[in-house]
Amino acid sequence: MDGTLLHTEPVAHALVIPGRTRSSYLAPTVMEGLVRLSQRLDLVLATGRSWDGMQAAVEGLQRHGVTIAGLCVEDGAKVGMPGSWTVLEPHRQWHRLRSWIDASRDPTWPPFAWQEDFQSCLVARADTYAEAERLAPRFFARAADDDDGPEAGLRVFRDGRKVFLIGEAVNKWQALGVLLGERAASGVGFGDGLNDVCWLTHIERPGTLHGCAPEVLRVVRAAGGIVASQGGHAGITELLRTLEAETR
């Protein structure tokens, strides 16, 4: 499961997850479902957030009795649990790449700031979605300059106002393989973003929310997966209850 669990719509008695610009909420019905499921399934959270960005959610879940078997953070660049992380590409020199980009930054680029909480990839945050959309291809062009740049083999993608620079072979599916081995393919999982397609296409039972990205919906339907009839807190609650019924 990924950040699909969290939504920005406030709800009574929710677990509040502070964010950089706004809070997210994990509904009580979602919490209750996760408690029950974690008693009979290995629950893994896979997210594009850093550990700093997920810590409040993970610790809140644990306080409420949810057992978490493992984490994939930074879009799969780092897996495990705090104190025992595995970095998928430990040879990367992200500080060197960051310094090189800063030194060669084009003044026509949209303004952005580096997110300091990411350790195993680079993440730049723009002020608006539109500026992030403009920034992403410029980052890609710069990162693809293998002859001049300090790091080869990178991919660039946008998630909201964040633009990621990460190893081209690193993603949530690769991270789940490191964490779970062959068991990853027999998993059930829910995601609603384009960075979830890489693993939703490989697992046994994918699921997503109403209103997700069209490519995600296509992948889940093609696999005979679960599509909630709603979005938001109600949608993820529906997915969890469907999974509970199927695993009794």
Can you name each region flagged by the protein language model?
Residues 26-114:
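Active-site phosphate-binding/coordination module
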Residues 9-35, 208-212:
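Basic, amphipathic juxtamembrane/active-site segments
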Residues 8-9, 54-57, 82-83, 199, ...:
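Short glycine-/acidic-enriched loop or helix-start segments at secondary-structure transitions
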Residues 104-202:
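Conserved acidic, metal-coordinating active-site core of Asp-based
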Residues 58-60, 135-141, 213-222:
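Short, aromatic/basic amphipathic alpha-helical patches
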Residues 20-24, 48-49, 165-168, 184:
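Short, flexible loop segments at the rims of nucleotide/cofactor-binding pockets, characterized by
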Residues 1-17, 45, 200:
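Asp-based phosphoryl-transfer active-site loop
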Residues 166, 173-248:
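Mg2+-dependent phosphoryl-transfer enzymes with acidic/Ser/Thr/Gly-rich catalytic loops
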